[in-house]
Amino acid sequence: MFTKKTHGVLKWLGIYYSVMLLWMITTAMHIPDGYLSPATSFVMFLLVFPFWAIGIRKIRATMNARNVPLIALLAAFSFVIMMFNVPLPGGTTGHAVGAALAAIIVGPEIATIAVSIALIIQAFFFGDGGVLAIGANCFNMAVVIPYIAYAIYQAVSKNTPINSSRRLVAAFLGGWVGVTVGAF
């Protein structure tokens, strides 16, 4: 069911997120309702909408019925991993997002859709981030993180073997920089 590349990436999943949680010094914060003006929320929604359209087009073009469960698995993984908050100094918490790993496995376009699904469910059912701020939260965590993480992963790992430790370092760097940039 999984390709050799996907299997190799999943092999490093536990190590990657263990290291990521230990070294996380920034927070991917959900923006609540009332923090942004309605005009800003609308603009952020307009900014994220083209990325959703690109992701949906990519899913339609490249995914088949056999691979659709992978998107659901990545969305569920992102949803679950965002529920584990790590206390940070200053009275706030941080959490892993799962967007970097999703981008490495299926590409940043499809990862945007998977993470957006998780964020929308969290906003509507758990109050984690505001409903009006869905565009801003999806832009910060479902667009910025996957695209930056994927670019860094590709630049650092280049054509190394799938079981190379360089790929683990590339995944860590991509995830860490992606979360850091997404937090700003």
What is each stretch, according to the model?
Residues M1-Y16, L36-S41:
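N-terminal membrane topogenic signal
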Residues M82-I145:
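Alpha-helical membrane segments and adjacent membrane-interface helices in multi-pass membrane proteins
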Residues A53-R60, V86, Q122, F126, ...:
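Membrane-water interface at transmembrane helix exits
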